[in-house]
Regions:
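Acidic donor-binding segment of Leloir-type glycosyltransferases
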Residues: 22-65
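N-proximal low-complexity "stem/linker" segments adjacent to membrane-targeting elements
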Residues: 1-27
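The conserved acidic donor/metal-binding loop of glycosyltransferases
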Residues: 89-93
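Cell-envelope/extracellular polymer assembly enzymes that use nucleotide-activated donors
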Residues: 3-6, 34, 184
Length: 186
């Protein structure tokens, strides 16, 4: 049976953030997904963090020379088994029930690509919330990062993006550019 979801997490020098992300994945109620962590030439590797979750998650850790986020995402997708690949930045923390909500929505309305808003964690200080707002405001992101559920046109953002594997392959993956590498998905 094919895995339904593969989480792809490129990481560069963020072991603490990866720990928080993996912890959030252990709290998902939908099981049977895999996690592909791609270490992109870090000086602060997260191998030990990944090993800590090996009994709770189907996790695969890869260490490779630095090539940037796009190429690291492609590297992870090449090794993934999922029908859908969900690309997450290493500092993402998923809410409990994230994957159940994704599965429910895909059952209700099948889609080739999906994404989600980001929001400040309730524990953030006022300064952290202000920074988060400035980065997720409707005025700077077209609404999706500020919590709006629907847009007239969907522009997935690679920090929290799911895409059907066959569509990803048709697009040829991410560009090798170091910034703006997700432009082909817009």
């Amino acid at each position: 049976m094919m895995t339904r979801f593969s989480f792809i997490v490129p990481v560069f020098n963020r072991p603490d953030e990866v720990d928080e992300l993996l912890q959030s994945l252990t709290r998902q109620t939908v099981r049977g997904f895999e996690v592909i962590v791609v270490e992109d030439g870090s000086q602060m590797p997260c191998r030990d963090v990944c090993e800590k979750y090996a009994s709770q998650l189907d996790i695969h850790y890869f260490d490779k020379p630095n090539s940037g986020p796009g190429q690291s995402r492609n590297y992870g997708v090449e090794r993934a088994q999922g029908e859908y690949v969900i690309i997450l930045d290493s500092d993402v923390v998923l809410p409990d029930g994230y994957l159940a909500a994704v599965e429910q929505e895909l059952q209700r309305e099948p889609a080739d690509a999906f994404g989600g808003p980001d929001s400040a964690h309730p524990s953030f200080t006022p300064t952290q919330k202000a920074i988060s707002y400035s980065m997720t405001s409707f005025f700077t992101t077209g609404g999706i990062r500020g919590g709006k559920k629907k847009l007239d046109k969907f522009y997935p953002r690679s920090f929290n993006m799911g895409i059907r594997r066959e569509v990803y392959e048709q697009l040829g993956g991410f560009s090798s550019m170091r910034f703006g590498e997700d432009i082909d998905f817009s």
